[in-house]
């Protein structure tokens, strides 16, 4: 495995030098050269092995078998795996197995990887033309596209659920099987599948391909660039550029942030592709565009844990209010992809800002997204005070964040160490062993960080060597207290460009010790509103707010099971800090020198005085708080009154609602099996909408609650109208001059458990712009809205 892996990794890593590519300033180590040895990351890795081996490979392969015309050995898994996105987890699974095998050398993982890849190869060979995917009835859609029939929208293509996104997972799995795990046969499979795509789009114009790219397509441009990097054949680079979405790229080239309202994780993989193309082809402007995107998202659109987006979409950068109130906070997939982009930018720049973000997101979002006992994976991490997270169950849940989540915990070793011109760089303080084969050296990092504020590095070498060993100087460290020792004796380190460096002749058994004095920080939301999160070193602190009514905490296989849909605790009852910003940190005291536990004072209501905070990554199976609002004594009463009014209205509507879909948002509409004809979506000041010149429809459910009406939110000019049908029965019309419409259902539909709500064009050429559709019990609402 190791020899094959090194070949693939070196080919891809060195491909940036194929022509006028951008040079790498920092080199990361092959993940096979790093082994975790203890600590929370090692535990997460072990839990992930159990998760991977607990899945039935034949059930994951079933969609591929069906599309290849072969007899499946088992039925599809449920959830997203049998409702239109069939096979997407199979690609993630191949990537996760590849990373885990490279990271651990685990024999059972290796056997599973070999079996999965061999069965995929059997499917590809049966197809006869290089095609390999699990998209239901995929051959029909690809023939339509080949013949120029393209009907694209952000979450569909020719009436299928994002088939380009789906097939991207297969491409990525094959690439990782070769580049990461060294499986030679995967390279040929990857090239064959890429040639199939070349043939499929060969007759399409650039305009047609750009139209097709309106549908979510993952990072296909990155994959095709990688194939160019592996083969040197320019046709693949040209394909990568054709698959680069100009609607996203062009504003970034002009340093414009036009992200508001966009589906966040649709865009990040595209930007990874822009960066990969730049690295290979020397397109510095594309690299700069990727860098602008990164700084925009990290500095202006992210919360303290490193995550971004609400309800999967970028909200307005100057208004984080939805982040503080929604039960659908940052999506784990987003941070998975932001870390991939961060690694690429760090390698070509060496800028410490990238590593500071990487470390913060790794501890506080990625590590925290796995249940440390049950092993389940998290989709949304709400920032709403007093809410909670939902964990996947291995045999029931097959969301995108399960796929990327399986990969997340298989590659913790990839950024701990780096090198440049014979200099070893220690970027993160994680117990691990690095084998630097080129120099015949082994480095063992022993640490209990962040519980203990120090790390120790032991060197083993065949012969003495003079070289530099550098340790990252993180943003959170107290530089005045940093100290080094070599073999127990104080040593001097030079601080240059964000690294502490010791240069000397090293002997076998030499040990370097570094203190890591952490500082306490209060991190304000980027919109400068009065919400603060506390960090100790790189660690975000959180409060356990109890285990009250954690409904659906372990998800079932329903389409909305990934959402924490239990009661939202009233925000006016959540603790706030009463005081001033300049004294904020004085409210937080460390409880014990040996534990990462803090007590928070100056809190209202008084019952929360002295509430305990601990690392968020240790906070599980409970409601929690990450952000506290800071108010002055004078503001407190009015602020509580305002919150109470807003929460009363929200709670009333929540209690009345059985089911709801946000119009124009990808996952809510997909979860409600949206269908449409001649319909458009858009966003206005961060608010999504859908309109139609014909019709669109959703499947809605009662979920055991009484329903007697449909409530519709819309906006537009007064000239627009629409007709509303439920299960084929017209229940009324809506006029553009109104924004809220409550339409009673016929009594014969009250006891139904499912409905099709269909909105059709009325007398006007186009309907109003619709924001949301709810199935409600109308006694709680006015019928004259």
Name these PLM-found stretches.
Residues 1-21:
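Bacterial Sec-dependent N-terminal signal peptides
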Residues 21-107, 111, 142-180, 217-235, ...:
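Aromatic (Trp/Tyr) and acidic
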Residues 124-125:
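Extended, charge-enriched "interface" segments that sit outside catalytic cores
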Residues 138-161, 187, 191-211:
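Asp-box/WD-like beta-propeller blade repeats and closely related beta-sheet repeat scaffolds
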Residues 157-158, 203-210, 253-261, 321-330, ...:
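Active-site-adjacent structural elements in folded domains
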Residues 290, 355-364, 369, 373-460, ...:
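C-terminal beta-rich recognition modules with glycine/proline-rich loops and embedded aromatic residues
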Residues 469, 482-484, 722-724:
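Short beta-strand elements bearing conserved aromatic residues within extracellular beta-rich modules
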Residues 489-509, 515-529, 678-707, 711-780:
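Beta-strand-rich ligand-recognition modules
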């Amino acid at each position: 495995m190791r020899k094959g892996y090194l070949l693939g990794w070196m080919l891809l890593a060195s491909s940036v030098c194929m022509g006028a590519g951008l040079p790498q300033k920092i080199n990361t180590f092959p993940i096979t050269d790093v082994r975790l040895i203890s600590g929370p990351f090692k535990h997460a890795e072990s839990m992930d092995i159990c998760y991977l081996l607990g899945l039935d490979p034949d059930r994951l392969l079933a969609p591929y078998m069906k599309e290849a015309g072969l007899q499946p050995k088992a039925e599809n898994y449920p959830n997203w795996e049998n409702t239109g996105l069939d096979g997407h987890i199979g690609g993630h699974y191949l990537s996760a197995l590849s990373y885990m095998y490279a990271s651990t050398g685990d024999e059972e993982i290796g056997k599973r990887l070999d079996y999965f890849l061999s069965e995929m190869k059997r499917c590809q060979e049966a197809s006869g033309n290089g095609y390999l995917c699990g998209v239901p009835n995929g051959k029909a859609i690809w023939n339509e596209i080949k013949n120029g029939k393209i009907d694209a929208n952000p979450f569909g293509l020719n009436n299928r659920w994002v088939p380009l996104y789906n097939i991207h997972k297969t491409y990525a799995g094959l690439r990782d099987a070769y580049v990461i795990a060294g499986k030679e046969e995967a390279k040929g499979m990857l090239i064959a599948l890429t040639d199939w795509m070349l043939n499929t789009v060969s007759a399409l114009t650039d305009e047609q391909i750009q139209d097709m790219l309106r549908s979510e397509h993952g990072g296909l441009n990155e994959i095709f660039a990688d194939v160019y990097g592996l083969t040197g054949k320019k046709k693949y680079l040209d394909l990568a550029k054709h698959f680069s979405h100009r609607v996203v790229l062009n504003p970034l080239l002009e340093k414009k942030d036009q992200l508001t309202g966009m589906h966040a994780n649709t865009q990040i993989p595209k930007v990874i592709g822009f960066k990969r193309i730049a690295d290979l082809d020397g397109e510095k402007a594309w690299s700069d565009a990727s860098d602008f995107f990164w700084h925009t998202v990290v500095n202006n659109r992210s919360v303290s844990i490193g995550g971004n987006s609400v309800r999967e979409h970028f909200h307005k950068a100057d208004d984080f209010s939805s982040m503080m109130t929604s039960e659908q906070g940052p999506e784990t997939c987003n941070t998975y992809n932001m870390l991939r982009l961060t690694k690429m930018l760090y390698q070509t720049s060496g800028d410490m800002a990238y590593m500071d973000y990487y470390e913060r997101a790794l501890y506080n979002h990625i590590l925290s997204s796995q249940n440390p006992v049950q092993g389940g994976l998290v989709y949304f991490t709400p920032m709403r005070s007093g809410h909670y997270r939902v964990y996947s169950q291995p045999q029931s849940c097959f969301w995108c964040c399960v796929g990327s989540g399986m990969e997340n915990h298989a590659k913790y070793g990839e950024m701990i160490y780096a090198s440049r011109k014979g200099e070893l760089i220690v970027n993160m303080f994680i117990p691990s062993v690095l084998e630097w084969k080129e120099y015949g050296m082994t480095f063992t990092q022993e640490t209990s960080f962040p519980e203990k504020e120090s790390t120790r590095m032991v060197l083993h070498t065949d012969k003495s060597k003079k070289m530099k060993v550098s340790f990252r100087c993180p943003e959170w460290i107290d530089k005045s207290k940093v100290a080094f020792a070599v073999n127990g004796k104080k040593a001097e380190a030079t601080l240059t460009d964000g690294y502490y460096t010791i240069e000397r002749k090293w002997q076998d058994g030499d040990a370097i010790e570094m203190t890591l004095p952490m500082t306490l920080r209060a991190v304000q939301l980027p919109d400068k509103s009065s919400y603060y999160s506390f960090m100790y070193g790189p660690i975000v602190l959180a409060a356990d707010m109890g285990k009250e009514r954690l409904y659906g905490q372990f998800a079932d296989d329903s389409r909305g099971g990934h959402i924490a849909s239990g009661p939202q605790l009233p925000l006016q009852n959540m603790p706030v800090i009463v005081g001033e910003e300049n004294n904020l940190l004085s409210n937080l005291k460390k409880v014990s020198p040996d534990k990462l536990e803090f007590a928070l004072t100056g809190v209202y209501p008084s019952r929360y005085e002295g509430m305990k905070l601990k690392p968020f990554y240790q906070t599980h199976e409970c409601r929690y708080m990450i952000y506290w609002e800071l108010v002055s004594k004078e503001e407190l009463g009015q602020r509580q009154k305002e919150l109470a009014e807003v929460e009363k209205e929200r709670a009333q509507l929540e209690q009345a609602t059985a089911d709801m879909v946000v119009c124009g948002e990808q996952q809510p509409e997909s979860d409600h099996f949206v269908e449409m004809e001649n319909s458009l979506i858009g966003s206005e000041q961060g608010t999504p909408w859908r309109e139609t010149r014909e019709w669109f429809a959703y499947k809605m459910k009662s979920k055991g609650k009484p329903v007697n009406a449909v409530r519709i939110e819309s906006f537009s000019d007064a000239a627009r109208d629409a007709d509303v049908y439920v299960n084929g029965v017209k229940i009324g019309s809506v006029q553009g001059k109104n924004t809220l419409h409550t339409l009673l259902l016929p009594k014969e539909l009250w006891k139904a458990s499912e409905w099709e709500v269909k909105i059709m064009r009325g007398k006007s050429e186009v309907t109003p712009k619709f924001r949301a559709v709810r199935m409600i019990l109308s006694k709680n609402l006015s019928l004259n809205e």
